[in-house]
């Protein structure tokens, strides 16, 4: 099925992409459309707001994590049942992963993904502090790369009617259509912390109200008919299929419990789909207040912000003990970033699960970026020597016991030969976030281990 899309990009971060993209998703839905929302890059937070606006899962399109060949199929899978897609970009339009030499065209940029899908770009321009200069900016972005088509501009944070008039004249001079002009509106600001926006799950009811406000403002100030008219795509791609990706390798049904709630909010929609395709029953539990579901054979602990909830996580000693006992019985446990912090003995002095011997602490040092990683040892997910591309995104540090076996060794500039994570028995825990669609064998292997082991909580 061919579904047209628009990519919402900007000259730089902080221009209002998430606000405009989320509001556009909500406004199109309010107008009767079924909208498929996407985010370029590995970001887990923005898709949570997209999902609130669209009423369906937000998904990621990241050619660095999954490769170029999967972008079209993952897009086709994600738009099933929709009549239009909105793709929120990352950073500036042409910003992505910089090669070792620097200065090369950046892989994984919004422009890269838009070109792969044939999606026109709507540029969000922060109009504060400028007027006629917008013409030069638009001219530069429109002519920089012939593979990227700027279909229109949405002017954000416009100061007055006179300011808007001058800006529109500048856009006309550059030959770029104005699709909307958003006034400066304080109510559209979302809360942030050291790793970006506060997640929609944590923000709760206020997140829903914020999305409603974004929707109302975009519906009032953006020409939705013009947006729809400029949407486009290349020929239809065959949709990605989780069943074909993993095959049904489980010898018997297995129950996989995935941590959720406010502390564990990072995950890709395709992960649960692939676990089910591999034969698992997927159930969620909240480690802040719940115990493991009855009959749990394996546990997935995704990323999130456990350092915001250390006392609450520590206080639920029942589920901590259950996870420890399940891991000790050889059950597969897959933990990424927040999950790793939850599995160690203590986090900032608070007792955690004690599955991985070591301690973790919050720091002021940001570790952020793509990582080329090689599996150090066979595990419940990967074979020794298997290569993956993942993403690191945290401000914490773990000190492991001397006898630990690392999960990964990183390769590449600035991180060459860095060890990450820990593997023992059925446990695979590390800082590295991976996209399951890129490593379907790991998902199939995890479920097969769960079905064979079946210690059951």
From Swiss-Prot:
Cofactor: Mg(2+)
InterPro entries: CbiA/CobB_synth, Class_I_gatase-like, CobQ/CobB/MinD/ParA_Nub-bd_dom, GATase_3, P-loop_NTPase
Cystine crosslinks: none
Active site positions, chain numbering: 337
GO BP: any one term: cobalamin biosynthetic process
Domain GATase cobBQ-type: 255-441
Similarity remark: Belongs to the CobB/CbiA family.
Name of the protein: Hydrogenobyrinate a,c-diamide synthase
Lineage, uppermost ranks: Bacteria, Bacillati, Actinomycetota, Actinomycetes, Mycobacteriales
